[in-house]
Amino acid sequence: SEIPQPSLDFEQFSNMIQCTIPPGEECLAY
């Protein structure tokens, strides 16, 4: 399993997950 973004921090990942549940188009815009 290769990681596309090794610099992906858990904070960003957690933020993306939380922004994926609600209509977080602005969140995914980063």
Swiss-Prot record:
Location(s), subcellular: Secreted
Maturation and modification: Glycosylated.
Keywords: Disulfide bond, Glycoprotein, Secreted
Domain of life assignment: Eukaryota
Principal localisation: secreted
Tissue expression: Expressed by the venom gland.
Cellular component terms (Gene Ontology): extracellular region
Role: Heterotrimer: Snake venom phospholipase A2 (PLA2) heterotrimer that acts as a potent presynaptic neurotoxin by blocking synaptic transmission and synaptic vesicle recycling. Enzymatic activity is essential for the neurotoxic effects. May act by binding in a calcium-dependent fashion to neurotonal pentraxin-1 (NPTX1) and neurotonal pentraxin-2 (NPTX2), but not to neuronal pentraxin receptor (NPTXR). Also binds to taipoxin-associated calcium binding protein 49 (RCN2), a protein localized in the lumen of endoplasmic reticulum. Monomer (gamma chain): Snake venom phospholipase A2 homolog that is neither toxic nor enzymatically active. Does not bind calcium.
Subunit structure: Heterotrimer of alpha, beta, and gamma chains; non-covalently linked.
Protein family per UniProt: Belongs to the phospholipase A2 family. Group I subfamily. D49 sub-subfamily.
Protein name: Acidic phospholipase A2 homolog cannitoxin gamma chain
Species whose genome carries this gene: Oxyuranus scutellatus canni
